[in-house]
Amino acid sequence: YTSDNQYASSAKAEHDALAYFIATSNCDAIDGGIVVFSAGNDALNRAGYPGAFRDYISVTSFSPDFLPASYTNYGPGCNISAPGGDAYIASNMTATVLSTMPSEVNDGSDYGYMQGTSMACPHVSGVAALGLSYALKQGKHYTRNEFISMLLTSVNDMERYLDGTKNSNGTMYLENYRKKLGTGAVDAYQLLMQIEGTPCLKVGVGAEELVPLTQFFGGSASRR
């Protein structure tokens, strides 16, 4: 698919089912459903569908070195990033993700090492589920858009690492990924603190940050 309209018309049954899910409230903490998809593993400068659709969250992948995975899609349609593994940066499978998988695929075991944005995607859906569970415990309720905004801002910055090159299945020019991996690397702790109402700030070593206190304490706050 190359556009939202093409996806919505060509995959109508899927689109309509997900639209129903989005519009239906099944949890007291939120007024609708959240759809999370992988961005794709083609190293393309755009998210693949269905994840690229405007109402869904599309997840890119970074490897254990906190840099983009060699295969991840990036660019338009991508919303947030999470660990997905990258076998090319290590001599064995330690740089990939231990995942559940059909036992008949892996010599009778229910687990195997894999990589991909499909490994990254469950990190984000899991963090979202954890956040909604905590919101229920806290007696909080959010609109769908409010919660998605909180999720997409509960991230660690990746931009300062996107400089130079990385050797992973070829040479990757990291500047090509700037502002294209989504808002950053998903952080469960930051989401829980947002739900709790506790300010949670992270600043890089040697960096300076100007923090407006009104963002956390209202218009009457003053710096001391």
Question: PLM features: what roles do these ranges have?
Answer:
Residues F62:
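Carbohydrate-associated surface elements
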Residues N26-V35, R54-S58, C78, E146, ...:
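Loop/turn elements at helix/coil->beta-strand transitions in domains of secreted/extracellular proteins
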